[in-house]
Amino acid sequence: MICPEPVNLDLNRMAKILRIRPEDAHKGTMGHALLVAGSYGMAGCDSVAAEACLRSGAGKLTLHTIQKNRVIMQMSVPEAILLLDSGKEYLLASIQDLSPYQSVGIGPG
């Protein structure tokens, strides 16, 4: 939903937007997100954005980041699936197939 005007988010509005998870829900039924993030020295941005994505309700998260951020990301967000880029300082490769993902975030870090 795209909203051209600012909207105040109160409990009533949020109750209409947010859904209760079914009791039989699991990571495979709650959506797969892709986060394209990270340059050298900016792994904190990746970590915060990845946590926010998972806390917002994504069942699975794939994080496309550079090789140098691998250890930091595996330690700070171990539940994220890492898709490591060949770039040393910043992302070089593009992701050709976005069909596995229900949402894509680009740009933090």
Task: Please place each PLM-identified region on the residue numbering.
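Small-residue (G/A/S/T)-rich helix-start motifs and N-terminal tracts that mark the onset
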Residues: 1-109
